[in-house]
Amino acid sequence: MTNTRKTHPLIKIINHSFIDLPAPSNISAWWNFGSLLGLCLAIQILTGLFLAMHYTSDTMTAFSSVTHICRDVNYGWLIRYMHANGASMFFICLFLHVGRGLYYGSYTYFETWNIGVILLFVVMATAFMGYVLPWGQMSFWGATVITNLLSAIPYIGTTLVEWIWGGFSVDKATLTRFFAFHFVLPFIIAALVMVHLLFLHETGSNNPSGLISDSDKIPFHPYYTIKDILGVLLLILALMILVLFSPDLLGDPDNYTPANPLSTPPHIKPEWYFLFAYAILRSIPNKLGGVLALVFSILILTLFPLLHVSKQRSMMFRPLSQCMFWFLVADLLTLTWIGGQPVEYPFITIGQLASILYFTIILLMLPIVSLFENKLLKW
């Protein structure tokens, strides 16, 4: 008799995706982040759902409703901090997942990669809107500064910003619509994840060597289910250490002050995971130029398949490209640090140099080094 999991119309989809899926036999721990991102999304949707039961999206009561959740709701503080720090874990996993894709040439799966870039944009938009909801000082001013960037668009900019605000400033209408979008977007993310996996399973997973592994596949279960469970336990451990020992480590103290349109905080900055893009935005004196650089800093990921000129897919056997990759990582860490610093000398200059270096490494240095390595192969 045939197994139910192989014949049942619904169960067989799950079976082909997570149980009998043929997987390369040599994928390393860097391939764990897909499942960890799925876990992060599940944690965020669940904790967010329970927070939404007690949160009110009104400028008068939003701040106090978050306080009420932390003080009066049973384990509300735990749910709130799991949600806030869960976002940080989400982005750590996202950055590592994208980094893995760049290092091992996974971007040659064109559709999977581009859906991934769209996912990155949507997750960033969701996180930004979520940061506005507690209605603290940094929520309000962050929303004001970032939405104001759209006014740099010629002709329609100002109208567009006022349309998004629902008035002439960030106010009740803005908060309500941000809450609505913040609630619905994670479900859109979940749908996009399905599409991401659909395209991935058309081709099969990449592996560290970058070589075709069709001749050497193993079933996903039990080998990689066990491996993923280890990753899950480590992620939950890290998240709970963060939540239970220093829940405000990655937050901004200014967000414990209720939003006040009449008082601007000395340093307006977003959450840590946006700082690299914020540094690129600030490094260009022109408003429109800054906005374009900000968008292109993420959109540039879509160019990687086109910029790939190497004879080899993965960087595993390309030491010069590896050097360039780690230069890029160091540069992104520098940008993250600069994004959190005040706009003064020497931070302005460092930020400008790091921004130029970011685009130069991706658009110029990596392809040149790859071509040089191709030449070395003929020696």
Curated annotation (Swiss-Prot):
The UniProt annotation places heme b b562 binding at H83, H182
Q: Name one Pfam family in it.
A: Cytochrome_B
Q: Name one GO molecular function term.
A: ubiquinol-cytochrome-c reductase activity
Q: Name one GO biological process term.
A: mitochondrial electron transport, ubiquinol to cytochrome c
What keywords appear on the UniProt entry? Electron transport, Heme, Iron, Membrane, Metal-binding, Mitochondrion, Mitochondrion inner membrane, Respiratory chain, Transmembrane, Transmembrane helix, Transport, Ubiquinone
Q: Where does heme b b566 bind?
A: H97, H196
Q: How does it sit in the membrane?
A: Multi-pass membrane protein
| Residues binding a ubiquinone, per UniProt | H201
Q: One GO cellular component from the entry?
A: respiratory chain complex III
Give the cofactor note: Binds 2 heme b groups non-covalently.
Show the stretches that span the lipid bilayer: 33-53, 77-98, 113-133, 178-198, 226-246, 288-308, 320-340, 347-367
| Family as reported in the entry's similarity comment | Belongs to the cytochrome b family.
Q: Cite any additional comment in the entry.
A: Heme 1 (or BL or b562) is low-potential and absorbs at about 562 nm, and heme 2 (or BH or b566) is high-potential and absorbs at about 566 nm.
How does this polypeptide assemble, per the annotation?
A: The cytochrome bc1 complex contains 11 subunits: 3 respiratory subunits (MT-CYB, CYC1 and UQCRFS1), 2 core proteins (UQCRC1 and UQCRC2) and 6 low-molecular weight proteins (UQCRH/QCR6, UQCRB/QCR7, UQCRQ/QCR8, UQCR10/QCR9, UQCR11/QCR10 and a cleavage product of UQCRFS1). This cytochrome bc1 complex then forms a dimer.
The UniProt function text for this chain reads:
Component of the ubiquinol-cytochrome c reductase complex (complex III or cytochrome b-c1 complex) that is part of the mitochondrial respiratory chain. The b-c1 complex mediates electron transfer from ubiquinol to cytochrome c. Contributes to the generation of a proton gradient across the mitochondrial membrane that is then used for ATP synthesis.
Please report the name of this protein according to its UniProt entry: Cytochrome b
Instruction: Identify the gene encoding this protein.
Output: MT-CYB
